[in-house]
Amino acid sequence: MNYRLSIYFIISILFQNCTQVTTESADNDIDQSGPPIDTIDSSTTISGITVNGFIDTSSYLNSGFTFLNPTQINKNREAIGGDSYTEVYGFNIPEENRARGIRWNGDDETTNLWKPQGITGFVRDGVRYLLVTWYANNSSDYKGSRITLIDISPSSNTYLKYRHILLTQPTIPTSVSNYTQYNTFAPLDIHAGGVAYFNHKLYIASTNLGIRVFDLNKIIEMKTGDTTANLCGKSDNGDLYAFNYRYILPQTGYYDINGGANPFSSIQINAEGTELWTAQYYAGSADASIVPKIYGFPIASTGMILNEDIKLIIPKNSLFSDYHAHGMQGLFRKGSKTWLSCTGSPSNSYGSNARLARYTDGEPDTVRYRWPYGAEALYYESEYDYLWSLTEHEPNSGYSNGSTVNRCIFAVKFANYE
């Protein structure tokens, strides 16, 4: 970079830090004066990353359990429909780009005991479902992680009804202090930062391990009525408990991925249905010296993740002084383009420092759009051409903004971001 361009780059960065973006078009402007600083800026097949064979952990499920699928789940909570989702703090999507959205019920949109993270969806017996992952927080952290199954079909008799389902795994902790742990299954303590759906299975990002797998046809009903909500596992008399959750979704296996592709902060299947893509979350401040990357792992029609033709992309983002895409919370891949849900930008736009960033392989920068405060993962619903996301924070989490509503799930018209 010559002296004149260096001065221009410094001035532009200072301007971004001191000025609030006030229009969508301004936020989409690309400063391409800075050169690419990595040699890998397009989809590149790499070596060194190893997907170990699928580790089947499902033997603990051969104990006389009765399995259910999503259509058989009793949904006991109701989301808020209409335009109420636009009332959350920092919701800055232009009206012409909005498709639809929902808000959680009062308990779920304000709790600090659980944090929503990943999102995906599927159709079963003509009914559209969204599925959201959460991790347990604060005094509930020992409960691990859960998913939420939401009916979003307007013609369905359970429209906007939803149910929380606890995630479990077979490794029994050696000692616990917060609850009574029985045999057979235990909570799954992961961040659950992203989730992808493929052929009735869920693939959930596991930060340092790789990818955990769950079969949606193997939901198990629990014994409820435990007023303490502090029992988990199969008791000596055969009763099943999960902190008073009515259902669990047990892990059936996992993929241990080695070679430095971690942290596995988010995950999503590409539009072509041939690859699972994961992104690394690194903040632009505390982790400024680390280069965030995204990886593509081929998936067979059987649902097996393959240890071949693994791809690497290092997306650019000129909002950060090092031109790297920090703060990646979610991603979606279509063709040679990747859409990134990013937080922690050094500039603010209508109450939010999040951006939806579109990166095309080989380009020196992303195209950026306004994106709501606290935005997390991405999911593409191809039948309707919707790009879904969700926001994480409960009211006044992180910022004392006076808002009583922060959390929502929303969809935008994907064509407006292509």
Predicted regions and their residues:
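A short beta-strand motif characteristic of beta-propeller blades
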Residues: 97-110, 163-185, 252-257, 308-321, ...
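Structural motif
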Residues: 139-149, 210-218, 285-299, 346-358, ...
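Short loop/turn segments immediately following beta-strands, especially the blade-tip
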Residues: 150-157, 214-238, 291-309, 414-418
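Blade-loop segments of beta-propeller domains
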Residues: 101-122, 133-137, 142-152, 156-196
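Beta-strand-rich domains and repeat architectures in extracellular enzymes and scaffolds
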Residues: 61-142
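Loop/turn-rich, solvent-exposed surfaces of beta-rich toroidal or solenoidal domains
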Residues: 279-281, 286-293, 308-363, 368-376
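Structural signature of eukaryotic scaffold interfaces centered on beta-propeller domains
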Residues: 109-126, 187-198, 259-275, 324, ...
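Bacterial Sec-dependent N-terminal signal peptides
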Residues: 13-43
